[in-house]
């Protein structure tokens, strides 16, 4: 089942491991590490990233939708 993550982007529900808030130093370090290894996908369309989706393939996807809203969509 596809879940809308904002601005015309969707992900497969079965491939998402977790949704976390985009704040904190540890998250910034993790983002920069994955950006260097080409495993970061920006789905914000230029807007501020509010949440991070962690995928089963070790990729992370940045979303402009709040984590609480995404959690409701995954239910």
Which ranges hold each PLM region?
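C-terminal structural segments of small proteins and small subunits
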Residues: 51-75
């Amino acid at each position: 089942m596809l879940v809308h993550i904002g601005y015309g982007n969707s992900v497969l529900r079965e491939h998402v491991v977790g949704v976390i808030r985009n704040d904190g130093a540890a998250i910034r370090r993790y983002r920069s590490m994955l950006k260097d290894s080409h495993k970061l996908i920006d789905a914000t369309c230029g807007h501020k990233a509010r949440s991070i989706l962690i995928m089963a393939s070790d990729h992370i996807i940045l979303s402009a939708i709040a984590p609480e809203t995404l959690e409701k969509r995954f239910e």
